[in-house]
Amino acid sequence: MKKQEKELMLKQIIEFERQTMFKLDVKNDKPYYQGFLMSTSDYLPDNLVIDGELRCFKESKKLPKGLKVKKKLDISETNITEIPYDCEFGSLDMSETKITKLRDNLELDELRTYNSSLQQLPKGLKVKGTLCISNTGITKIPDDCEFSELFSQDSKLTKLRDNLTLNYLNVRNSLLTELPKGLKVNGDLDISYTDIAEIPDDCDFDSLYMCSTRITRLRDNLILSDLWIDNSFLKELPKNLVVFNMLKMTNKSITALPIDCLVNRI
């Protein structure tokens, strides 16, 4: 490291510590912090490495150059409008921000974009866990996008690709009008308040929430953890239905449980 660069780094560290009362180390010629850091991002020194998580305060307006956050970078509800191209992070929460673009080929543990200004997902996005695009203007998910859980309630999402296998899917009150072929959800499937009118016979799920939908039929022999059918168009329960936890219904057309229906509680 050149003398001038080192002097600038030390100057930035001193100013950061004066503003925040947090102490930084120097490791491999870079500012270093281990643990969970909460700060106004404007005070962060360039090339800071955080071996943990960073939560930026609401008044934050920009991120420093060369920031690396090994775990979660939380800039939700801040005034940050862009993420530098050289910024690295394990997970990102950019909810309630004016950010409009993410760089291509991101690989993350989680991505939360709730109520942000993001209009489309980047190319080559890979999310190991939760992808949240709720209450955004995103209308489609690229075919090369990978994720294991999707939160897309109150969104403009209109289509999902075929043969998805997920741990959780919530498209409540979205613009989705049909479920894709070969959909498999290991946990909850929530399609409440959508215009989805039928569930494909090859669709698998552990729990189903279909309140206020136009669905009139469920296939026989379903075994579920929960089933919520409030205000749906369902006129009768399927044969041999098993619900381990709760069957929630206010459908006036269904007045009694069939003899072959097993339910823990209603």
Regions found by a protein language model. Name each.
Residues 3-12, 69, 127, 176-177, ...:
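Structural boundary micro-motifs
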Residues 1-63:
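N-terminal capping/linker segments that flank leucine-rich repeat
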Residues 33-39, 52-60, 71-79, 88-98, ...:
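Concave beta-strand-loop units of leucine-rich repeat
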Residues 3-7, 18-20, 66, 72, ...:
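Intrinsic disorder/low-complexity segments enriched in polar/small residues
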